[in-house]
UniProtKB/Swiss-Prot annotation:
It comes from the Eukaryota. Cytidylyltransferase required for protein O-linked mannosylation. Catalyzes the formation of CDP-ribitol nucleotide sugar from D-ribitol 5-phosphate. CDP-ribitol is a substrate of FKTN during the biosynthesis of the phosphorylated O-mannosyl trisaccharide (N-acetylgalactosamine-beta-3-N-acetylglucosamine-beta-4-(phosphate-6-)mannose), a carbohydrate structure present in alpha-dystroglycan (DAG1), which is required for binding laminin G-like domain-containing extracellular proteins with high affinity. Keywords: Cytoplasm, Nucleotidyltransferase, Transferase. It comes from Mus musculus (Mouse). The record marks R203, K261 as: Positions substrate for the nucleophilic attack. Its EC number is 2.7.7.40. Pathway: Protein modification; protein glycosylation. It is found in: Cytoplasm, Cytosol. GO terms for biological process: axon guidance; isoprenoid biosynthetic process; protein glycosylation; protein O-linked mannosylation. GO terms for cellular component: cytosol. This is D-ribitol-5-phosphate cytidylyltransferase.
């Protein structure tokens, strides 16, 4: 077993609670375990995440749990979701011996906490059993405390929420075993030996078994201890083991749509899209004047029209280092508006604060430098030449996961042309924020 570091920067979760910290993009969950009635408290809880799969169905050499999503291993997102739930005391991840060092590197690089490692077995059930042994007091090398309840969850289901974790844990405390379920999407059929339809299941009467699942530790550990070699080799359903060997009928808990499992290549694209959507929900507009009539405020209004579902806040450049730190706790997109001239000193100050926040360690941060001038007063080519420093700066900060680009806005005296330029600027910024395309880093775009 390998304990992970005990602290890390916070980051956006999916309606999960935990200590607030720099980089927390979403509000804490309304769940309050500390103030709950005794019967509604989870008790001592640990989690086991089997991560020894080889990704055969995905058809890639890299096991899917280590495939990168936005330049970060998929399993890191799952660990993030679990460790932000403060009442989960220990998280045991089972990985193959050949991937043990890679897993240690992930824990160290992304500052994951409360993580211990155990070696995976040859099958899913054997891996889970090894994870349970890491928590069992009857094992001579056990360094962890046996929990009252243990959660079993897939390393490739990164969008698990605290609400469903709490509900399955409380159900497990009452019934001994519990698991999340979802409605069947497709009808399940049984083929005959010669490849013809034998019978089909009534979709309305059946459900898909999902993760997370939770058990009284003594129940599931006893089930695995009694488990036959056949079940350990070919079984896949933990709830069935609790029923078969400990006679505990699991309580089935309806789960949210986000419980889906990353299984195929296209699922990685879907996961990336969901993560991008989560971290693109807020934009901070940094401008160099408080004047309500300034182009910065006009651009802010244009962004509100373009992105009517996003939260858009603003601050003044003079406040960088003060108010801006409050925005950093919630925001992954910054639009810096400079009407008069490029002010690289203030820009570098903002970038330095972002780097010190450790925010870019976990997610790509978008920074767009908007420079406003009347295209009729200064030749566009001349203006672009004066901004070549943006490319060098963008290349420098890209190494730290900050995606910086420039935008030239036509600050025309003609009201119609100005409104057109503001609309185009808002559309360009929206695309940069939503897509987070590293290929556009250092580019000077024109609206």
């Amino acid at each position: 077993m390998e304990p992970g570091p005990c602290s890390r920067p916070a980051e956006p979760g999916h309606c999960v609670s935990g200590p607030a910290g720099a980089g927390s993009a979403f509000p804490e969950s309304p769940l309050s375990v500390a103030g709950a009635e005794p019967g509604n408290r989870p008790g001592t809880v640990a989690a086991v995440l089997p991560a020894g799969g080889c990704g055969e169905r995905m058809g890639v050499r890299t096991p899917k749990q280590f495939c990168r999503v936005l330049e970060r291993p998929l399993i890191s997102y799952t660990l993030q979701a679990m460790e932000r739930v403060c009442w989960i005391k220990d998280i045991v991840v089972t990985v193959t011996g050949e991937n043990m060092e890679a897993m240690r590197s992930i824990i160290q690089r992304y500052g994951h906490k409360r993580i211990s490692l155990a070696e995976a077995g040859a099958t899913r059930h054997r891996s889970i059993f090894n994870g349970l042994k890491a928590l069992a007091e009857d094992q001579p090398d056990c360094k962890l405390t046996k929990p009252e309840v243990v959660i079993i969850h897939d390393a490739v289901r990164p969008f698990v929420e605290e609400d469903i974790l709490l509900r399955v844990v409380l159900a497990a405390k009452e019934h001994g075993a519990a698991g999340a379920i979802r409605p069947l999407v497709s009808t399940v059929i049984s083929p005959s030996a010669d490849g013809h339809l034998d019978h089909s299941l009534d979709r309305a009467k059946h459900r898909a078994s999902e993760m997370p699942q939770a058990f009284l530790f003594d129940v599931i550990y006893e089930a695995y201890q009694q488990c036959s070699d056949f079940d350990l080799e070919f079984g896949t359903e933990c709830l069935q083991l609790a029923l078969k060997y400990c006679h505990r009928k699991a309580k089935l808990v309806e789960g949210p749509p986000a419980l889906w499992k990353v299984t195929y290549k296209q699922d990685l694209c879907a996961a990336e899209a969901m993560i991008k959507e989560k971290i693109s929900q807020e934009i901070c507009v940094v401008m160099n004047t408080k004047d309500e009539e300034s182009v910065g405020h006009l651009l802010e209004e244009a962004l509100r029209k373009e992105l009517n579902c996003m939260k858009i806040t603003s601050t003044v450049m003079d406040h960088i280092g003060g108010d801006i730190r409050n925005f950093i706790e919630q925001c992954y997109s910054f639009i810096c508006v400079n009407v008069v001239s490029p002010d690289s000193q203030e820009t570098r100050k903002l970038l330095r604060i972002l780097e010190e926040s450790s925010l870019p360690l976990l997610y790509p941060v978008v920074v767009v430098l908007v420079h406003c001038f009347d295209f009729t007063s200064v030749p566009l080519a001349q203006k672009m030449e004066s901004l070549v420093w943006i490319r060098g700066l963008a290349k420098e900060v890209k190494e730290r996961n900050i995606l910086l680009s420039g935008l030239l806005l036509n600050y025309s005296q003609d009201e119609q042309k100005l409104q057109e330029s503001l609309g185009q600027s808002a559309a360009i910024i929206a695309a940069l924020v939503k897509e987070r395309n590293s290929a556009l880093v250092g580019q000077l775009l024109v609206a």
